[in-house]
Amino acid sequence: METVHSTFLLLLFVPLTQQAPQSQLDSHVNYEYATGNSEETKFSQDYEDKYLDGKSIKEKETMIIPDEKSLQLQKDEVIPSLPTKKENDEMPTCLLCVCLSGSVYCEEVDIDAVPPLPKESAYLYARFNKIKKLTAKDFADMPNLRRLDFTGNLIEDIEDGTFSKLSLLEELTLAENQLLRLPVLPPKLTLLNAKHNKIKSKGIKANTFKKLNKLSFLYLDHNDLESVPPNLPESLRVIHLQFNSISSLTDDTFCKANDTRYIRERIEEIRLEGNPIALGKHPNSFICLKRLPIGSYF
């Protein structure tokens, strides 16, 4: 009787324990054993239920990977344009030197040529470097330059057109170099300092100073001059020619031989010491001066 009863109960519950649908099993397995992808599976199913309902099919959203050309276009839009050639030329100079309010200080930085300068530069101090030559290209398009100082370089030559376009240049210092001659000088020059070079008289043309009507200070001491440069302008106040090889003077060197009343008003100082000349033997050379030159008279 008990056996019959057990069999009856078994037959009663078997229909109630059917296998779950495959989709539910898959979902259950994904949830239990692949938890890392469970959300991804659920999102995919929801997406299909929502958009792929058989009536209005919409494209699935996809991730677009830009190609190399697209990336380059985006890059070009973000990165600012490169500096112009002028800016590239200026930046290195102002990193190596000091650029301040129109003045450029390039002292003792071992440059061997004139660096590119900001166009607004008015003063350049390039002292104690290794510059060997000056050319017209060094100062092209630099109309505002008023003072140049190249003291203590190795300059041997200066092209004649180097300063021709520097119409505002007033002070030019070339002291302590290796110059053998003077170039053509700009018309508004007030000071020329070329002391401690190797300049000879043949290295100065007859008209070098003739038209320099604003020149006040001339320093040519410690060179190899055999005579005083000709045609010195009336504007000169100070002339330094000491320690050269000057051995003779004429009545026209500083004065006018044919005009005994002529007085050279502006001359304040002439230095001729250290030359192989006895100034006392040339009294007529100084008759127009208010002060006698400094030097040996005997």
From Swiss-Prot:
One example GO MF annotation: growth factor activity
Q: Pfam families under this entry?
A: LRR_8
**Sequence ranges of the LRR repeats:** 112-131, 132-155, 156-179, 180-199, 200-225, 226-246, 247-277
According to the record, glycans are attached at 88, 258
State the source organism's domain of life.
Eukaryota
Q: How is it modified after translation?
A: Contains keratan sulfate.
Q: Where in the cell is it found?
A: Secreted, Extracellular space, Extracellular matrix
Please give the positions of the paired cysteines in each disulfide bond.
255-288
InterPro entries per UniProt: Leu-rich_rpt (IPR001611), Leu-rich_rpt_typical-subtyp (IPR003591), LRR_dom_sf (IPR032675), Mimecan/Epiphycan/Opticin (IPR043547)
Q: Which GO terms describe its cellular component?
A: collagen-containing extracellular matrix; extracellular space
Keyword Manganese in annotation: no
What is the annotated signal peptide range for this record?
1-19
Record's family? Belongs to the small leucine-rich proteoglycan (SLRP) family. SLRP class III subfamily.
Stated role: Induces bone formation in conjunction with TGF-beta-1 or TGF-beta-2.
Protein's recorded name: Mimecan
- Organism listed in the record: Mus musculus (Mouse)
Gene it is expressed from = Ogn
